[in-house]
From Swiss-Prot:
Transit peptide: 1-26
Gene (UniProt): AIM36
Name of the featured protein: Altered inheritance of mitochondria protein 36, mitochondrial
Location(s) in or outside the cell: Mitochondrion membrane
Organism: Candida albicans (strain SC5314 / ATCC MYA-2876)
Signal peptide interval: none
Gene3D superfamilies in UniProt: P-loop containing nucleotide triphosphate hydrolases
High-level lineage: Eukaryota, Fungi, Dikarya, Ascomycota, Saccharomycotina
Disulfide bond annotation, renumbered to this chain: none
Protein family membership: Belongs to the AIM36 family.
Family annotation (InterPro entries): P-loop_NTPase (IPR027417)
Length: 292
């Protein structure tokens, strides 16, 4: 019986040898020592091959990249749907200055130059004659220095007319869109003008600067003293503030200008000039005596 069974089992024996060669642990008994039942039984052994596991880290990395790409496209679509910005915050304007190279890192006029260049500001003046009177008094009291009047409104108009000026396109865009000027813009324009003066022959002389209708917010006042120079005195023209300011400014603008007076008064730099009952010459003389 065994002799008849062996030819039939030769294919199985051959496959068993191959399987045993690849997996030596499957059998420890030589084939010729095994009984026919053992040989038949061993042919039914199923060998399970280990499946290679997909790297989990690589899968997570792919998912993370896909998520970033999806977020990027969604964010871009949301930005495109945003309405145009209606105003600049002070921080946004500072970013604009840094990106366009318009911002200077240091104060324009250091403390050591405060005796050479002095700055007097008038938050609100309506009567040009009063402005000239202030300039004449200042010239009379400090004959060794020249007097220079700076009008921010005039500087803004010059920027708008000249395409080569630094703030021309910004001002043009703001006006076309009906947007208010961002905090610090007027101070930046004044700073540019003062810088230009300092780099001319005019800047070699001792100079008393009078800045007309400036500052009209405390933010502008603080920015001026941070970026340009200290302010010597804030001059308040009593008559114009009392009678002309309500006629020409909104309630909010009036509060802002009066807050400027309060700001400088808190640091001892505000002086009210009352011409009707107290001669301005005497008041201004007191200012100059305090400064000497």
């Amino acid at each position: 019986m065994f002799a008849r069974l062996v030819p039939r089992l030769q294919p199985q024996l051959l496959s068993k040898r191959v399987l045993t060669a690849r997996y030596p642990m499957l059998t420890t008994t030589p084939i010729y020592h095994q009984t026919p039942m053992q040989i038949i039984k061993r042919n039914y052994v199923i060998v399970h091959r280990e499946r290679k596991k997909e790297p989990v880290i690589r899968y997570l990395f792919y998912m993370l990249v896909a998520s970033w790409v999806a977020i990027y496209f969604v964010a871009n679509r949301v930005d495109k749907k945003k309405p145009p910005q209606q105003s600049f915050t002070e921080r946004e304007f500072q970013s604009y200055e840094e990106e366009t190279g318009l911002k200077r890192r240091n104060k324009l006029i250091s403390h050591t130059m405060n005796s050479k260049y002095k700055f007097y500001v008038i938050p609100y003046v309506h009567d040009e004659e009063e402005l000239k009177k202030v300039a004449n008094l200042l010239q009379h009291k400090d004959e060794n220095a020249t007097v220079k009047i700076i009008d921010p409104a005039q500087l803004i108009e010059e920027q708008k007319k000249d395409e080569g000026m630094k703030y021309h396109y910004l001002l043009e865009d703001l006006d076309e869109q009906g947007r208010p000027y961002p905090p610090g813009l007027i101070t930046a324009v004044i700073k540019q003008e003062i810088y230009k003066i300092l780099n001319t022959r005019e800047g070699t002389f001792d100079t008393n600067f009078i800045i007309k209708n400036y500052p009209q917010t405390t933010n502008e006042a603080i920015k001026f003293e941070n970026d340009i120079s200290d302010i010597q005195k804030c001059l308040i023209l009593h008559y114009d503030m009392l009678n002309e300011l309500p006629k020409n400014k909104t309630d909010e603008e009036q509060r802002a200008i009066k807050n400027v007076d309060g700001y400088f008064d808190s640091v001892g730099k505000s002086k009210t000039l009352v011409e009707k009952f107290d001669p301005m010459d005497k008041e201004f003389e007191e200012i100059m005596l305090e400064d000497i």
